[in-house]
Amino acid sequence: MTTSVDASIRVAETGDLAFLAESHRLGHSAIANARGGDLDIALRGRPEPIEESFAASLDEEHTHVLIGEVAGVPVGYLVGTVELLRTGDHIFRVSDLWVHPNARGIGTGGELMRKAMDIARGAGCIGIDARALPGDRVTKNFFESFGLVARTIEVHKSL
């Protein structure tokens, strides 16, 4: 059950790079042993040095890096990019979403998603995409609570 607090969302700035990098590493360590986690990290993880990767994201015109705070303390982040589709339409793709485990269930992730959806609507996007690992029902249920539904399933076989 989510207990709402006064979470605030703001645009990330260069002073947030250490928080973003630490959060990214914590998020990856949490999924590394989950089904599909190691390959997801290898395919989609940010390259080292992670701080430089986030700095590049801050400078990208169509990428939005958001910080979720509680009482002025950063506790989560979201990275999303407005991408051009072959049809000429745009979609907002969430590549990173992480909230510190001690700050989960209080509404920060929800506020990050609501802000991302506002940005997507403002950019004229036809939809918003995000990923959840197989078996990660908490993440899947979180995204479904915002109306996101599975539209594809990736399959893999290790060789």
What is the predicted function of each stretch?
Residues F19, R93, V138:
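Amphipathic alpha-helical recognition patches that constitute DNA-binding helices
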Residues T3, A7, V11-G15, E22-A34, ...:
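Acetyl-CoA-dependent GNAT
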Residues G110, G122, P134-T152:
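Conserved active-site alpha-helix within GNAT-family acetyltransferase domains
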Residues R104, D129-T139, H156-L159:
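Conserved beta-strand-loop-alpha-helix junction that forms the acyl-donor binding cleft
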Residues D89, G107, V138:
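Residues that form or flank phosphate/diphosphate-binding pockets in enzymes
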Residues A120-R131:
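Conserved GNAT acetyl-CoA-binding A-motif
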Residues D96-V99, G105-D118, N141, S145:
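Conserved acetyl-CoA-binding loop-helix of GNAT-fold acetyltransferases
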